[in-house]
């Protein structure tokens, strides 16, 4: 967006905030409070263009991690948006991007740095459509609430623009400072002609100043940052120009952690603007992202909810009433599950310590109780009004030998609890009507590993499975007879590990449509079938492929669907929008 329109855009965003109408949303893992990924509308056919094109969020980076969780989505005033948490690799840290999915060519509305450094982002966010915010859990993401600027800082040629923030109490001596510097806009015809360069200096807590070079030609490396180009779009998704930024994301070390001062100085050979300032400690954290209706990242703000979290936040963030829930993981160590009251600005926190850690194991509420699985084969339950009280836990291996880790989110149909285990089982429990304790009902052997949260339509329960790094498929289990059928047999397909949940369009009585992606390999060779997104029809007997996206790379997290639009990403930070 051109700078002359920035003030108008901010005022427009504020006006929109007061009039936003969200008609639909996939706002949490599994799309709803039950985590049952059933949708009324989804693309059962797709164009070749949609299946072979993607939004590249990587900014040129590459790694073993990218989009490794499920996006959240909403439709506002007729336009469908996706919010994607992903790894921006070493240059950009963890990022949150807002995508306009309804445009003829989907595009990035804004992107915001949300963590200090590169790393897997496995926690699916929670979208608060009422209060217009997103809660994210990430590694190296303890944001300092008091490191911010109230308005952008204008830069003139040859004169240093400065930001000074004092009185800081630092969580760690080493921290990472994020400073996006806007340097101009060009038309499509003048693309790449901007010559604005400069220098920057960052100092924290009396430590050694870090001197940086901002260059239009040199590659980003060490203390050098190359200019970044971001296309701008018209209402139909057509490119109508380019914005240019220097995205400073640099580690600085303080010599004193108390009453520390952060000093930033930027000098350009042209005009520009310091858009915002953020600083992150190298600790896990949950952050509230506000200003999501802004038309660019300058209006997006970060507020620390829980800082200095030990271990990785690898579970989805779920919400019931005024509480959000998430778990942590660190190898075989006993770790914590959190309940956080987000109705208060103080974000009151309660925790319980599990026998082991929590990985992909999102929580569900049924009645007054919260249920979630864990490693070493445990099923936990807690009274939502007394979350940190000692409560008996259920060891599922006492009911099913060899059940293994529970690395799926719990799904409920309102009566029963369903989940899978890495030992290769679909399990069903029912809460005791008096005590809330989950009581074993039945299980079904899948004959393959599963981390897939079950999806239930009618009598059919669908789960994804995998065997090793190459084989996998989809199973259909009868809720009444517990019989297991192959939708896609593990022995039938190569490059087909399905670790995600299955999105289903249908009612389980006729033909259902199943949507999922595969976590396998890397290849752009046509028909190589690495890391694809798929749609299959299944009538209870026969499965037929309806479409498949291009061969790409590992796609772990799974799909989201809203307003008939499917989105999913992969480890190359490629985001597919299928409609």
Across the structure, where does each feature detected by a protein language model lie?
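Bacterial N-terminal signal peptides
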Residues: 10-19
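Sec/Tat signal peptide C-region and signal peptidase I cleavage site
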Residues: 20-24
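Autoprocessing Asn-cyclization modules and mimics
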Residues: 146-199, 203
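Solvent-exposed serine/threonine-rich low-complexity stretches and specific carbohydrate-binding patches
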Residues: 197-200, 211-219
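Short, surface-exposed loop motifs enriched in S/T, G, D/E and P with embedded aromatic residues
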Residues: 155, 209-216, 224-227
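Bacterial N-terminal signal peptides that target proteins for export
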Residues: 1-8
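Extended amphipathic alpha-helical heptad-repeat regions
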Residues: 183, 229, 246-248
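Extracytoplasmic/lumenal domain signature
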Residues: 25-148, 222, 230-243, 256, ...
